[in-house]
């Protein structure tokens, strides 16, 4: 089965699956940006709309997803993990959607490739991006190298310490990595600096935003490029066990990997959608990144969504052992799905994520990224509550090579 994606296939559903013409998911989303960026956002929305109607664009994207990215990614039955979580009342069969096997090691390449093709279509030769864990930065640097585009990556100084391997990879791929020292020197601050760059260079530059956050049309565009994950998973589930899955499980920071898996299933009401946030040191402390669990409505990086903020509306610092989840906001569509009760969201601590990473590594021979480990950790809470045999699909959104130093230090492994 060859992986193909088509905007028409994804978006011929009702309002549950797409924003309004104003870029709203219910009350969330919108365009809270300087006036100088509005023409670029309109241009991007028009370019994306036209591109999805262009067979040549869609065919080129699908060809590169197959021959360059390595899609489709397997749906793998994790038999030892399934056995580990078997209870007296149910056997929860666990399947992994192996986005970690993509070129560059994570789901991020799906969106980076698609947006690079849009940038070329718009005549933009300079690309900027933000990154936390480094995977989006690596993916963006990779596609820029592939197409001969100038590439500038903004990354917080704190994340650079945690993700030195990915920093080297970006530089090796020809990207300029700009260190961000303002604020907490993490993903939020890198995003702010990237937006400042875009405001100053909007005529020549395209900003490849890495998550389903930011001003419209970014949440929609990023979601649509990642929806290939869920489209493949839906077909693979039918082939593997003859039905749709009972539960989809994914980690959530900004929320792109989760939305890519969830989106094609949103109208399938029999399928539970569960997103797992980073509880850090605990949601009752000040050191966490559980935006949906503990946040309130506010505006960040051009979009209205749930945020971690104080009573005066000031954005608070987020904390997670995972650089990719260390963000005080979340994509507006996730906030909407939570409000209407279509998706459920929980959180796990740093310690729980580390335990899950170790468990999956030992039982399946797969070292997941720290971000992904948060989704695996939710199995400890989920499986004991199930009273029947259940098919669970986890989005294995990235591999853990980038995290080995952090994990070794945290687990005291020499």
Curated annotation (Swiss-Prot):
Pathway: Amino-acid biosynthesis; L-tryptophan biosynthesis; L-tryptophan from chorismate: step 5/5. The keyword Chaperone does not apply. Its cofactor is pyridoxal 5'-phosphate. The modification N6-(pyridoxal phosphate)lysine is found at residue 108. Residues 1-28 are annotated as: Disordered. The gene is trpB. It catalyses: (1S,2R)-1-C-(indol-3-yl)glycerol 3-phosphate + L-serine = D-glyceraldehyde 3-phosphate + L-tryptophan + H2O. It holds the Pfam family PALP. NCBIfam families: trpB. The lineage of its organism: Bacteria, Bacillati, Cyanobacteriota, Cyanophyceae, Synechococcales. It comes from the Bacteria. Belongs to the TrpB family. It comes from Prochlorococcus marinus subsp. pastoris (strain CCMP1986 / NIES-2087 / MED4). HAMAP family: Trp_synth_beta. This is Tryptophan synthase beta chain. CDD domains: Trp-synth_B. One of its GO terms (cellular component) is cytoplasm. GO terms for molecular function: tryptophan synthase activity. The beta subunit is responsible for the synthesis of L-tryptophan from indole and L-serine. Its EC number is 4.2.1.20. Residues 8-18 have a biased composition (Low complexity). It is an enzyme of class 4 (lyase). Tetramer of two alpha and two beta chains. The keyword Amino-acid biosynthesis applies. Keywords: Amino-acid biosynthesis, Aromatic amino acid biosynthesis, Lyase, Pyridoxal phosphate, Tryptophan biosynthesis.
């Amino acid at each position: 089965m060859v992986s193909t994606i088509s905007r028409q296939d994804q978006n011929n559903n009702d309002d549950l699956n797409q924003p309004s013409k104003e870029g709203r998911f219910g009350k969330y989303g919108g365009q809270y940006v300087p006036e100088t960026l509005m023409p670029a956002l309109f241009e991007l929305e028009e370019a994306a709309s036209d591109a999805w109607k262009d067979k040549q664009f869609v065919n080129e994207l699908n060809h590169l997803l197959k021959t360059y990215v390595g899609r489709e990614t397997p749906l793998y039955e994790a038999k030892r993990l399934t056995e580990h979580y078997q209870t007296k009342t149910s056997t929860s069969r666990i399947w992994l959607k192996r986005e970690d096997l993509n070129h560059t090691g994570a789901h991020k390449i799906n969106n980076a490739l698609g947006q690079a093709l849009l940038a070329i279509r718009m005549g933009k030769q300079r690309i900027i991006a933000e990154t936390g864990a480094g995977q989006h930065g690596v993916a963006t640097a990779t596609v820029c190298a592939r197409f001969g585009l100038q590439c500038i990556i903004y990354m917080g100084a704190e994340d650079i310490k945690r993700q030195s391997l990915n920093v080297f990879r970006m530089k090796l791929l020809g990207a300029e990595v700009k260190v961000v020292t303002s604020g907490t020197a993490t993903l939020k601050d890198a995003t702010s600096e990237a937006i400042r760059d875009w405001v100053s260079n909007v005529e020549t530059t395209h900003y490849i935003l890495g998550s389903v956050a930011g001003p419209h049309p970014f949440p929609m565009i990023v979601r649509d490029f990642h929806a290939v994950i869920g489209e493949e998973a839906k077909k693979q589930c039918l082939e593997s066990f003859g039905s749709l899955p009972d539960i989809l499980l994914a980690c959530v920071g900004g929320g792109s990997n989760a939305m890519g898996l969830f989106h094609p299933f949103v109208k399938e009401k029999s399928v539970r959608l569960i997103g797992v946030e980073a509880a850090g040191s605990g949601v009752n402390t000040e050191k966490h990144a559980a935006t949906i669990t503990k946040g309130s409505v506010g505006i960040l990086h051009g979009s209205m969504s749930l945020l971690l903020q104080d009573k005066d509306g000031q954005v608070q610092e987020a904390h997670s052992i995972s650089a990719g989840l260390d963000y005080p906001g979340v994509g507006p569509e996730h906030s909407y799905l939570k409000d209407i009760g279509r998706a459920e969201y929980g959180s796990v601590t740093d310690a729980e994520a580390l335990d899950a990473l170790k468990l999956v590594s030992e039982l399946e021979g797969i070292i997941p990224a720290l971000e992904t480990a948060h989704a695996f950790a939710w199995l400890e809470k989920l499986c004991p509550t199930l009273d029947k045999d259940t098919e669970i699909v986890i989005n294995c959104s990235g591999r853990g090579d980038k995290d080995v130093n952090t994990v070794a230090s945290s687990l005291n492994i020499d």
